[in-house]
Amino acid sequence: MAKLLPRIGSRKNGRISSRKNARKIPKGVIHVQASFNNTIVTVTDVRGRVISWSSAGACGFRGTRRGTPFAAQTAAGNAIRTVVDQGMQRAEVMIKGPGLGRDAALRAIRRSGILLSFVRDVTPMPHNGCRPPKKRRV
């Protein structure tokens, strides 16, 4: 009979999650990726290790409602609530993408009480790279 080995990153093994929660993070980076279909908010420390994340889909929005500004606001609030409890006071914000949730997510971040050192738009812009997809005909 084979012996069951505990998986290192499993939910049952509480060692990793408890170590994550024990860290005090005074400064971090908030990444907002706003597409037309969804908004993903990831909070990392300065070295880039993920502390918390949320998305409109993970907050319970489905279908076309995931791309709305209210869904982005909810996702940003959920992602930031955990890091504020861990003691984050200052953050940099990196916003990527053309979606409707850009401004709503930024508004939710401002309201959370975290001091923003800077807000940067890191949307990738091609220097005449790949050919874009053909126009939709509805």
Curated annotation (Swiss-Prot):
This protein's GO CC annotations: chloroplast; ribonucleoprotein complex; ribosome
Disulfide bonds: none
Keywords tagged on the record: Chloroplast, Plastid, Ribonucleoprotein, Ribosomal protein, RNA-binding, rRNA-binding
Location of region: Disordered: 1-22
Comp. bias intervals (Basic residues): 9-22
GO MF terms held by the record: rRNA binding; structural constituent of ribosome
Alphabetical GO biological process terms: translation
Gene3D superfamilies, sorted: Ribosomal protein S11
Location of this chain's protein in the cell: Plastid, Chloroplast
Pfam families attached to this UniProt entry: Ribosomal_S11
Record keyword Cytoplasm present: no
HAMAP family membership: Ribosomal_uS11 (MF_01310)
Family named by the database record: Belongs to the universal ribosomal protein uS11 family.
Subunit structure: Part of the 30S ribosomal subunit.
Entry-linked PANTHER family: 40S RIBOSOMAL PROTEIN S14/30S RIBOSOMAL PROTEIN S11
Protein name: Small ribosomal subunit protein uS11c
Classification lineage: Eukaryota, Viridiplantae, Streptophyta, Embryophyta, Tracheophyta
